[in-house]
């Protein structure tokens, strides 16, 4: 596993552009209000754009964090034909979000309730009905199933497991089920982390 930086946005920028952080435009997790991070510029060449130019169908499912709604960094403006997931990194800390995005449309997730005072989707879920990673897995499988066998595709599946919900404190390892670790005599956060990675 390789990470181009110690934090999310610059590391993803390195992966998407092929440049090291000395040459990338995104070098930190700089937020842009009301939602999102500093966006990739229009002229930035991404791996998705390279695939698209070569005739591939392209999709990003999961976490983005390189441009919020309507920005030059939005995945649909950076070479991805299809996007489903989180635009904002802090929003992606929550595995039971009130909404995700499908392309540029907000998709409400009924039954998920988040203490979300800033309006950017970040916070800790108090109502948990739909687990985001199950939704992302379903979307990824559907994207693959819908592909034409005669046309290549590129799918960037960007899951955040086992990232803790930083806004959740000690409750931050949100999983639908602790599985084999439910009866372990460990702190809840450690049992949640073990369930995420196994």
Spans of model-derived segments:
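Formylglycine-dependent sulfatase
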Residues: 1-198
């Amino acid at each position: 596993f390789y990470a181009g930086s110690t934090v999310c946005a610059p590391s993803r920028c390195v992966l998407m552009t092929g440049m090291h952080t000395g040459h990338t435009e995104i070098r930190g997790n700089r937020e842009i209000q009301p939602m999102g991070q500093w966006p990739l510029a229009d002229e930035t060449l991404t791996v998705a754009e390279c695939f698209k130019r070569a005739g591939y169908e392209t999709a990003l499912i999961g976490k983005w964090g390189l441009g919020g709604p309507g920005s030059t960094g939005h995945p649909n403006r950076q070479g991805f034909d299809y996007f489903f997931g989180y635009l904002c990194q802090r929003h992606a800390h929550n595995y039971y979000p009130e909404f995700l995005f499908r392309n540029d449309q907000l998709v409400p997730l009924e039954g998920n309730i988040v203490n979300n005072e800033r309006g950017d989707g970040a916070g800790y879920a108090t109502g948990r009905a739909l687990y985001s990673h199950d939704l992302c897995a379903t979307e990824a499988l559907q994207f693959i199933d819908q592909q034409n066998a005669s046309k290549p595709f590129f799918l960037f599946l960007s899951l955040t497991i086992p990232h803790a919900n930083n806004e959740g404190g000690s409750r931050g390892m949100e999983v639908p089920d602790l599985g084999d670790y439910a009866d372990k005599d460990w702190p809840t956060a450690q049992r949640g982390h073990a369930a995420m990675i196994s």
